[in-house]
Amino acid sequence: PETIARPRRSHRRLPFMPAPTAVVTLTDVLAARRSLAPYLQPTALYNYPSLSAMLGMEVWVKHENHQPIGAFKVRGGIHLIDNLPAEQKRAGVITASTGNHGQSIAYAARLFGVRAVIAVPQGANPAKISSMRNLGAEIVFQGADFDEAREWVEAEAGGMGLRYVHSGNEPHLIAGVGTYALEILEQQPR
């Protein structure tokens, strides 16, 4: 039998949160590339013949590990924070994360002088927590897992006066990370 997971509670709209199902277009991704240009260089795309031979197909690797936080998510964090209205930048941001998303928001917040609060669950990767903290984020331990940390953020963001940054439903975040696909198409257009 097939089991279908149901969300624990319905999704509600939070302060400053974009409407669900926002569509991100190629125009949005091109705008994100312009926004990111002063802060990030394109990453290399390499073909590894031995890896291709081992897998029996042509394989190309996009080296997002060369980004400042070692992950592609920094693209989304920078584009999102760069495009926040001034009042939201002054207020600061809050999000939940177990790692790369939090690092992305912490890095971008430091870049633009914005306060960042990151809720992490108990037991989250200590190296990721240390990185977020070193990037200037305020770390708050909440819950046993990501969902509990996220639920805490959703409940507290408005009362704290912070702009909630959803880890996925953010058009600027999505457009920012989409820039790596543009680079792939330009670097290996076939």
Describe the predicted segments one by one:
Residues 2-5:
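Short amphipathic, helix-prone segments within low-complexity/disordered or flexible regions
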Residues 16-190:
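PLP-dependent amino-acid enzyme catalytic core
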